Amino acid sequence: MFHRLLNKSKILACDDKSVNDYIINVKNLSFFYSKKKVIDNISFRVKFGEIITILGPNGGGKTTLIRILVGIYKNYVGLVEYAKDFTIGYLPQHFSVNSLIPMTVEYFLNSSYTNRKRKLGVGDVLKDVNIEKILDRQMSEISYGELQLVLLARCLMLNPDLIILDEPVSCMDINAKNSFYKLINKLISIYNLSVIMTSHDLHFVMSNSYRVICINKSVYCEGSPSEIVKNEKFLKMFSSYA
């Protein structure tokens, strides 16, 4: 699964002051695999229009947290509150294309949703994501960076309020990473989006995030990039950052 359409009003929606002006409010969240605790008492909020990056080591709970937020994992302990009537688009870290099934990029996008779910057509998002030139190519032949753009376009067809991306630039070169982050900033303005990303790219994170949350099972520190780089817990977790 590489996206998820969620109408959170059907799961949990609150009107009280605790979620006023916030799209997601997480309180005292914990999660266990069997008897092993992998998320430990995490709390944070996401405001409308923010770019939030979640940093942490491998095995620190980033992907588990993301899967809770998008509704894949439900047997958690704690509270996750959502604003009413909003849609989440989700891109996981890994997505594979079956090379034995011929499918052009254009066909893939057009066949992605029923008319009921689709809020925008392929033509509405092509120019914004800059994939017009690869519509006739096979999905199995495009590069990783191009695949991420196609999946992002597919996500935007839902006209989501929030997009969640798990390590979206992990296999891109420096130029591609820079272009992708610039695109995300542009899309926030065009589509009035909020964004949550996980990442290991500290330097790109610091220049492309409104807020950074560092986790290793629990939240170690949280704040703006300028605040985070001075935080002793951040410096201890990422001792190689300079």
From Swiss-Prot:
GO cellular component: plasma membrane
The organism's place on the tree of life at top rank: Bacteria
Subcellular localization: Cell inner membrane
SMART domains in alphabetical order: AAA
Catalytic activity: Zn(2+)(out) + ATP(in) + H2O(in) = Zn(2+)(in) + ADP(in) + phosphate(in) + H(+)(in)
Membrane topology: Peripheral membrane protein
Pfam families tied to this protein: ABC_tran
Enzyme class (EC, first level): translocase
Amino acids binding ATP: 56-63
PANTHER family reported for this sequence: METAL TRANSPORT SYSTEM ATP-BINDING PROTEIN TM_0124-RELATED
Assigned protein family: Belongs to the ABC transporter superfamily. Zinc importer (TC 3.A.1.15.5) family.
Subunit structure of this chain's protein: The complex is composed of two ATP-binding proteins (ZnuC), two transmembrane proteins (ZnuB) and a solute-binding protein (ZnuA).
Name recorded for this polypeptide: Zinc import ATP-binding protein ZnuC
Organism for this UniProt entry: Ehrlichia canis (strain Jake)
